[in-house]
């Protein structure tokens, strides 16, 4: 617009300014003025008049004037000086609701540093006396959750060396739990009002990078109501090599869903040979959300990698993989709806107010429930007899049926847990019994740890499960029976030992995932994809070892120590990134169709 026209408009506006006060205001906003210029209601605070004037809705004329000025001269550009800088505002953090405060408000998590066998024994005895929730442990530390008012009682039962060797790991447990819930609902539905959440790949913005599209599901922890439709969607899209199966029914009547992934020969002229099968499970303990997400990530990577990754294609031609994201659907659902730190299943016990059996202590081999038989309230309650836990009994029955009826040969079993970053092999019930293939277990375990380290530079320790709790705390690492016979976390009656001994699965492992830091079971969502990637790499390494054991060391040693951590896309052939992007687009489109 020409300058003379702008000047003319400006003069017109300027001449009209005295008329602004004459423009009628809304009756609710009318003001009367005294001769002094003050409001007629002189008994009010002058500052209140200023605030009221500031908050008044602009008149029609004022809005017209402002819009005309902006259309002619545009909005003023902020200078780069100090006045243009945004004000520093305190970051607002939503506080945990009252229901969470009531349940966890007085709880903390303490980390005790342990140095010798005597300290371990003292901590074991004290935790049993006070019925404490032992979160996790490693070679030189143990994490315990307890109420603040119980701390003096605990310290009173410990030797002086332990009374000063602890630090708070989580100071505000209620707030930390609140922040761990998915962003779409930062607390369980019972604590935040009704919400509707479902899997929606199309929810990503159009600006998302192509390789990010496939990780939409893994941007947060997903409840059971999202996990199940996601599994069905994968099967509908990749039906050539993926099947949705049920490996049992829970105590509350839910299916235990699993994905069977593999490419079977099409020639049925001869009877198919025994199908070698690898089982990867998670979610045995309900609160270990990262294990559920990691199994899902590995399943997704194998399913979508077929035909694009030479390694994955070969493995799926050689093996069937059975992915069980959550062995404990009832407990997992309960952690989203009611109690984030629930560990056991939801089965009724002899005490109606203490439901639940620890699924990883309920298996039949070397079951030892005598220590907790009289206390169903214990976090490690193993039931009154072997296989009393419904889910453990159902999965064991499914596995036996696969072997005897469906001509399946289980060659590996991997049970994912959290936390402490350990790769554990049999036996867990006792260090006095050594596996016949101990050397092979150690070799493959070391290979898995090396694959993880090359992928993400994270260190995972490899050891027998019986030593996985306090291996260096016995004073003698070569002792036949370290202080785990009455350990902080009992390992008798585990799925690890049952699959290895009773089902003769020669390569059985329990992997405790991230981290070793300050999060415990409340690992932030930002760790979902990195954890999934590193364990995916380990599972690829396991498959290669089972195909040809000598390949594993060559494969891993071929990676230079200076290499950057590898990404899934690096395993694709040239030109397949575009195909992956197309698959992601189709995946989102079909997801929308499925929901509609």
Swiss-Prot record:
Binding residues for Zn(2+), per the UniProt record?
285, 288, 417
Q: Which residues form the propeptide?
A: 23-184
Predominant location of this chain? other
Give a GO cellular-component term. Answer: vacuole
Per the database entry, which stretches of residues form a coiled coil? none
The residues that hold substrate are: 285-288, 343, 360-361, 418-419
Please provide the record's keywords in A-Z order. Answer: Cell wall biogenesis/degradation, Disulfide bond, Glycoprotein, Metal-binding, Secreted, Signal, Vacuole, Zinc
Give the cofactor note text: Binds 1 zinc ion per subunit.
Query: What cystine pairs are annotated?
Result: 354-377
Q: GO molecular function: any one? A: zinc ion binding
Q: Which InterPro entries match?
A: Peptidase_M14
Give me the glycosylation sites of this protein. 370
Which gene is the coding source of this polypeptide chain?
A: ECM14
**Signal sequence residues:** 1-22
Localization: Vacuole; Secreted
Which residues are in the Peptidase M14 domain?
220-546
Biological process per Gene Ontology, one example term: cell wall organization
Name of the protein in its database record = Inactive metallocarboxypeptidase ECM14
The family classification in the record reads:
Belongs to the peptidase M14 family.
Q: Which cofactors does it use?
A: Zn(2+)
PANTHER family reported for this sequence: INACTIVE METALLOCARBOXYPEPTIDASE ECM14, PROTEASE FAMILY M14 CARBOXYPEPTIDASE A,B
């Amino acid at each position: 617009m020409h300058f003379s026209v702008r000047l003319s408009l400006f003069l017109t506006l300027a001449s009209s300014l005295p008329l602004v006060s004459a423009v009628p205001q809304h009756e609710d906003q009318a003001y009367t003025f005294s001769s002094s210029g003050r409001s007629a209601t002189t008994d009010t605070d002058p500052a209140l008049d200023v605030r009221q004037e500031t908050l008044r809705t602009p008149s029609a004329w004022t809005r017209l004037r402002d819009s005309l000025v902006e259309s002619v001269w545009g909005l003023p550009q902020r200078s780069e000086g100090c006045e243009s800088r945004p004000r520093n505002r305190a970051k607002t953090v939503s506080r945990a609701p009252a229901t969470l405060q009531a349940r966890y408000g007085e709880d903390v998590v303490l980390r005790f540093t342990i140095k010798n066998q005597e300290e371990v024994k003292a901590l074991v005895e004290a935790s049993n006396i006070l019925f404490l929730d032992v979160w996790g442990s490693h070679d030189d530390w143990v994490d315990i959750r307890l109420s603040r008012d119980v701390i003096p009682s605990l310290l009173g039962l410990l030797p002086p060396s332990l009374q000063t060797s602890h630090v708070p790991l989580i100071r505000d447990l209620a707030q930390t739990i609140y922040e761990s819930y998915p962003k779409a609902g930062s607390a369980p539905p019972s604590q935040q009002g009704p919400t509707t959440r479902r899997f929606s790949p199309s929810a990503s913005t159009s600006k998302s990078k192509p390789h990010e599209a496939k990780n939409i599901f893994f941007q947060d922890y997903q409840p059971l109501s999202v996990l199940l439709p996601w599994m069905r969607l994968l099967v509908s899209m990749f039906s050539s090599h993926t099947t949705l199966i049920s490996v049992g029914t829970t105590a509350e009547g839910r299916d235990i869903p699993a994905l069977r992934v593999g490419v079977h020969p099409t020639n049925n002229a001869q009877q198919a040979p025994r199908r070698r099968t690898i089982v990867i499970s998670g979610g045995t303990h309900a609160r270990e959300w990262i294990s559920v997400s990691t199994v899902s990530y590995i399943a997704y990577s194998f399913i979508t990698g077929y035909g694009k990754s030479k390694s994955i294609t070969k493995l799926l031609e050689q093996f069937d993989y059975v992915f069980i994201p959550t062995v404990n659907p009832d407990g997992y659902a309960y952690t989203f709806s009611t109690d984030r730190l629930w560990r056991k299943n939801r089965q009724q016990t002899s005490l109606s107010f203490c439901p639940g059996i620890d699924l990883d202590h309920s298996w039949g081999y070397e079951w030892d429930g005598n220590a907790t038989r009289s206390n169903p309230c214990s976090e490690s309650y193993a039931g009154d007899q072997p296989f009393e836990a419904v889910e453990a009994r159902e999965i064991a029955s499914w596995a036996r049926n696969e072997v005897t009826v469906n001509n399946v040969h289980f060659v590996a079993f991997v049970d994912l847990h959290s936390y402490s970053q350990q790769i554990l092999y049999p036996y867990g019930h006792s260090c006095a019994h050594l596996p016949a293939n101990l050397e092979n277990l150690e070799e493959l375990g070391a290979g898995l740890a090396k694959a993880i380290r090359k992928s993400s530079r994270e260190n995972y320790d490899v050891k027998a499960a019986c030593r996985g709790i306090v291996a260096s705390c016995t004073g003698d690492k070569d002792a036949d029976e370290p202080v785990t016979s009455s350990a902080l976390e009992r390992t008798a009656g585990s799925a690890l030992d049952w699959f290895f001994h009773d089902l003769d699965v020669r390569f059985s492992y329990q992997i405790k995932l991230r981290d070793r830091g300050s999060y415990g079971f409340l690992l932030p969502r930002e760790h979902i994809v990195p954890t999934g990637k590193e364990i995916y790499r380990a599972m690829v390494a396991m498959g290669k070892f089972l195909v040809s054991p000598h390949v594993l060391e060559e494969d891993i040693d071929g990676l230079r120590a200076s290499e950057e951590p590898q990404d899934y896309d690096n395993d694709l052939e040239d030109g397949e990134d575009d195909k992956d992007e197309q698959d992601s687009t189709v995946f989102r489109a079909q997801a929308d169709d499925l929901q509609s």
